[in-house]
Each structure stands twice: as structure tokens, then as C-alpha cells.
Amino acid sequence: MAFESLTDKLQNVFKKLKGKGRLTEADVKVALKEVKMALLEADVNFKVVKQFTKSVQEKAIGQDVMNGLNPGQMVIKIVNDELVNLMGSETTELPIKPGMDLTVLMMVGLQGACKTTTVAKLAGKLKSKGKRPLLVACDVYRPAAITQLQVNGEKQGVEVFSMGDKQNPVDIAKAAIEHAKSNQQNVVLIDTAGRLHIDEDMMQELEDIKANVNVDATVLVVDAMTGQDAVNVAQNFSDKVGIDGVILTKMDGDTRGGAALSIKAVTGKPIFYVGMGEKLSDLEQFYPERMASRILGMGDVMSLIEKVEASVDQEQAQEMQKKLKKMDFDFNDYLTSMEQMNKMGGISSILNMLPGMGGKMKDIEGMIDEKAMDRTKSIILSMTPQERSNPNILNISRKNRIARGAGVDITEVNRLVKQFEQSKKMMKQMPGLTGGKMNMGKRGGFKLPF
């Protein structure tokens, strides 16, 4: 996950400041030297790092420690505030017009940045917000680009406008606008051609589309794993074509994350969304304050709550709560809970948003067997409806049949049954989900659906 190494190094820096009554200039300079190295190793732009550490130093030297905070926590607060400022201070929304007024988005980027997939992800996101998007296939050069967009569009339930790979992209874009107007579609997403590198032909084609179509916003899709190259690409597109903002992809990968900390400061353009996985649902709104919290190892509880709310069917949750009270929890419910967890990105995604877990994910991920969840699902699906509803009837003969059907050893079936019984006992003691909004605990906690 992005920023793991940076998070770990920053936490080590802050630990050294604990126990001091006042932050001396020497304390701050030593700490900031380590912070500077950590940021540079995370591939943050050098000029950005220099300005960042200068700003933190000016605010931290001689700073009285606030009540209830130790010096380490005080520095964390200052660093947090500066990180938020660095990434944009406030969340920037895509400039989508209200109601049925047509918005045209031109999506641009280099090959390998997952642009076409991201365009489909964005269309699904807009559809979930009540918009009627239209995907437009203007990449007529890359083999299978049109097919890829059509397949992803179908999965998202979004229409894809295509005129094949023999037409001029400008003509396709113009025809798509007329099609959208005729069919009451209010957001047009133009998937333009990517290139292996920035060239004049590519830029001219983008300029031609902008000149012939009333584009409301040009959105650059860029690969976060390319580090400083991502920032350079953003700057080049901004200078030559003009962009309104960025979507960073592959932020769930083994990336140092420097692009997220540099793009706004270098280009002046905001980050709209970040791609956090391969699924079409893995596109998250970019919140500078939440990203700063993740970087500092303080988690992102608000995003987790939103994921839970979006993934859990409230009627289903109420029904499960009733079952738990009656101790009527069965394998159907167990399977539902697993599917809900999967919708939220899996165990690793959930843990990464919890406070204190940021710098520990490398160790924890080695202990998590995501494939075990797939095997568990296979075992449950190999049961008959009667067996899922009445786990008590699972004798040795039935378990052997289930193991053969799932392609696993019977020991895995026995292990699952044992885990199920343990979970059933624990569930009785866990507060359930209430109707409407998610049930918030006394300390701002929340109730997960499993």
C-alpha cells in the first residue's frame, strides 16, 4: 500500500520527540532532517520537500506544547496541517453541472496508466450519484481499447458510444455529444488515445477535440507508481493541453506515494480521485486531510465508515441483527458477511484505514491469506441450502462430500465449521447495525457487518 515506508519512518521520527517539555531548535532540525530524507525516499519533488520542511521548521521551533499533547504529538499536528496544505487543503469536486445540463469531460493520459479502466470507474461513480453518463471510445489506435471500454461499460451499466477504429476521433466526439443530447445523457466522458510517451501528434489531437467540442474539464489519468515521472507528465499535459485536475491510479500498489504529495504543489492542479484497486468500484474521492491522516499512521476512519455504509444493505443488516439476537446465525449469513467485506476491498483495505495500522501493514499482510476467503466461499457454496441453514446436520459424510465439491481437504471444512461456531458465540456479544445511518459508538466507532 502507498506510503507504508514513509509512514513507518515518520512514526519513528515522532517517537524520538516524546518526553521533551519544549521543542528546541536543535530538536526540530534533527527531526526535520529525517523527515526530509523520508520524503525524498518517497519520491516527493525536491523543491516541494525543501519548502515543506522550511514551513514546518518555522512553525515548530520554540512552539509551546498544547495542553494534552506531548512534543511528538505537537510536531505531528504541524506536519499534518502542512501535508494537508501541500495536497490542496480542501477536497476539489469534478466540475459537474447540476440537473440535466450537459457536462463534457475529456480524459487524457499515457498508456499503462489504466486510463480506459479509470474512465469506466468514473462513469460508474457518477451513475451512483444519479447522473446519466455516456462513455465515448475515441482511442482508435490501441488494439482492443474500444472492446475494453465496451466490456467495462457493460459491467457498470453505462452506454458506450463507438464508431469503430476507422473514424477520426474528433468526428466521434462530435457525434457522441449529439447522441447524448438526443438521449438525455448529462455527462459525456471522452476516452482519448494514450501514447507510450508525450508527442506532438498526441497533443494536437487533444487540442483538436477541445477546439471542436465544448469540453468542460480535461482530466489527466496518471500512474502513481511512476513517482516523479507522474509529476513531470502532469506538468507537460498542463503546459501543452491544459488540464483541470488529476486522477492518480495504482495507489494501492507498492508505490512510494510521492506523486500524491507533489502534483498539486508543482502543477497547481487538484487531485480529484485515486484508484485503490483493480475492481471497477475501487475509485475513491481524494480528501487531502484523510490522506494526510493515512500518511501519519492515524488511519482514515471516515472513509471506512463511508465504505461500510455503501456496502451494507440496511434491511439486510437489520435482519442479521434480529438473527444474532436469536442466535439464528447460519452459513448464509456468514457468506453474506464475507461478500460485504469483499465489497469494502477485503481485509487488507479495511485494516489499512484503522488508526495505527499504516506502518504495520507489511508485517500484517504476510499473515493475511486472502485466498483462504475464496476457499471458504467455495466450501459454503458446496453445501446444500439445508446444510447452510442448519450447520448442526454437518456429519462426517456430508463434510467429505462438501470437501470434494470445493476441491479442498476435509480438514479445511472442519476448520471452517469450528471458526463458524466461535464466530457465532462472539456475534452474540457484538452490537449490531441499526437502520438508517450506521450505528456510531460512544468513541466515534462503528459496527462492521461481520
Could you tell me what each predicted segment is?
Residues P143-L149, A230-V233:
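Short, glycine/polar-rich helix-capping loops at beta-to-alpha or helix-loop-helix junctions
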